[in-house]
Amino acid sequence: MNQVRKWNIIGGRVIKTGIAVFLTVLVCEFFNIPTIFAVITAIVTIEPTATDSIKKGLVRFPASTIGSAYAMTFTFFLGHQALSYALAAMFTIVTCQKLRLHAGTLVATLTAVAMIPITADHYFTAFLIRLATTSTGIIVSTVVNFFILPPHYVKTISGCTEELFVKTANVMEEWLTALMDGKVIKKETTYNLSKLTVLLHKAVQFVQYEQKDWKYHRHTKKEMRSFLLVQKQLHLLQQIIYHIDNLARAPIETCDWSQNEKEILRRTIHSIISILRNHCEKIDEEHFKLIDELDKQFWTNKNDLAHCKPNQYHHHFSSESIILFEVLSIHDMLEELKQIFEKYEGENQEKSILVDIK
């Protein structure tokens, strides 16, 4: 997987940007209008989703209109002076921010300052031409983003989800090593946990991208089920990572386990690691027995704390109780993941049977 990523230099968005620029130049040359502003607009209008291209395009057009108007106004009154550049940029930024045209502020400002040195007269004509070039760049880029290599993130999301299962298991294994040694977790484990969170946020962002364009493209029922599966998996993995983060912050060095308690906890976490690496497709009976033992430990610890007097103990949970609670919570998420997978597999089997009957 890493090797494929390493050599995947040119992605779909880069290709679409090149196509959009090429077509924009052709259109501008056909109508004999300047290309540079249209090309700038075309480049920035290519977004991760077609929906964003349309929405931000509708923002960038009025923003560029504002920038062009300020540029021509200050050039008319002040000429090609440094003050013209400064005032055009400042007024464009302030106006765009006040009108909440945030997505178009950069393009509008670039348009404003770039128009000044190339306009000597016929200011109103130059203003209209700039509207035409901006419109050309926005329209061409939006059409390209919509019809050419339309964004599909389902495979990317699935890849991220598989990676999350593996890396979550690896972090759990690193934490278990620290627990068994009775030491604070290593900096490397903390770093891996932060990378895990970044990967999760990246996957969630891809889900949001896919949802935005969902209404614009056709999908088979199988693709829809697959997308819903990974969406639910990511939601539960997010909760698992949250509980692992709590485990990483738990005071391991203050724990006082008996040998039997420590062994049951070790075996349970090993079982959780194995289930995660298997994408929660199967949970055996031995795992449920270990969870029952762990559950008994948790309630025993909690009941023991109930007899403590306030001046002897100032916390509602001991270190052991916190760890047991987080591990049991992770198990609950694993059960939900297994149920989701079984439901998905069952629907696929029903579909296959219906196809065979037909």
UniProtKB/Swiss-Prot annotation:
Superkingdom of the source species: Bacteria
Keywords of this entry: Cell membrane, Membrane, Transmembrane, Transmembrane helix
Residue stretches spanning the membrane: 19-39, 74-94, 109-129, 131-151
Extent of the signal sequence: none
Membrane topology, from the record: Multi-pass membrane protein
InterPro entries in the record: ArAE_1
Pfam families: ArAE_1 (PF06081)
Cellular localisation: Cell membrane
One annotated Gene Ontology cellular component of this protein: plasma membrane
Membrane found in the keyword field: yes
Recorded family membership: Belongs to the UPF0421 family.
Protein name: UPF0421 protein BT9727_2513
